[in-house]
Swiss-Prot record:
Pfam families: ThylakoidFormat. Belongs to the THF1 family. It comes from Prochlorococcus marinus (strain MIT 9313). May be involved in photosynthetic membrane biogenesis. This is Protein Thf1. One of its GO terms (cellular component) is plasma membrane-derived thylakoid photosystem II. Residues 180-224 form a coiled coil.
């Protein structure tokens, strides 16, 4: 990520790797992620650690829910990352390994690891926590806050399935990982708000598509019935002529 690209360069690289029309429902998210990744690629003290990888993967996966054609989703993620100098496969692997490292552990234990800045935690998580909590120069990204929230959600326990409780815990733990409480609260509130709006938009889109599908089926059925009626009428007329 050493080349000093402009945003125009990153967009050009993205369009080269993903030469497809993006549905309007997903265009804004794509543009925002592209700009954010571009800006992060120029931050001297930014490192794509596990919390960032988890957050990026989570935001992308959630906000591309229902994307069609499905085959384009992976290509879209890859193009976003590569156009800004990030390795999509490495980020996905990093996110997956870190999330898997906390599965099977209860939420209280995971909280303890975070509060102790990675002490006793699986190496994948400990490394990410050392990067943030142990540094005064690291560059924060809102995707890291989402990564922290998603990490907590992967732990076992009833509280792990309670979004409000998880957000509260993430807020309380933010300073332990070197994040600003105010920033984390703001970023997670915005994330949840956008999540609700996106879910509603996807649901509405699916309803519209389903309605259009039914109309097409009804029209096709009507055409078939009309054709059958015409054929029957012609047959009756032919019989009458013979008589």
């Amino acid at each position: 990520m050493s080349d000093r690209k402009t945003i125009a360069d990153s967009k050009r690289a993205f369009n080269h790797d993903f030469p497809h029309v993006i549905p309007s429902l997903y265009r804004r998210t794509t543009d925002e992620l592209l700009v954010e990744l571009h800006l992060l690629s120029h931050q001297k003290h930014f490192h794509p650690d596990a919390l960032f990888a988890i957050g990026l993967s989570q935001v992308f996966d959630v906000f591309t829910s229902g994307y069609r054609p499905e085959a384009h989703v992976k290509t879209l993620f890859d193009a976003l990352c590569r156009s800004c100098g990030f390795d999509p496969n490495a980020l996905r692997k990093q996110a997956q390994q870190t999330l898997e490292s906390v599965r099977g552990h209860d939420l209280e234990e995971v909280q303890g690891w975070i509060q102790q800045q990675g002490k006793g935690a699986p190496e994948a998580l400990a490394k990410a926590l050392r990067n943030t909590a142990g540094s005064t120069t690291f560059h924060y990204s809102r995707l890291m806050a989402v990564g922290l929230l998603s990490l907590l959600a992967s732990a076992q326990g009833d509280e792990s399935s309670d979004p409000e409780k998880l957000s509260q815990i993430a807020h309380e733990l933010s300073e332990s990982v070197g994040f600003s409480k105010a920033r984390v609260e703001k970023d997670l509130n915005l994330y949840k708000s956008n999540l609700e709006k996106m879910a509603q938009a996807v649901e509405l889109t699916e309803q519209i598509l389903e309605s259009e599908r039914r109309k097409r089926e009804q029209n096709e059925s009507a055409k078939l019935n009309t054709g059958s009626s015409e054929q029957m009428s012609q047959g009756v007329e032919a019989c009458s002529n013979i008589s």
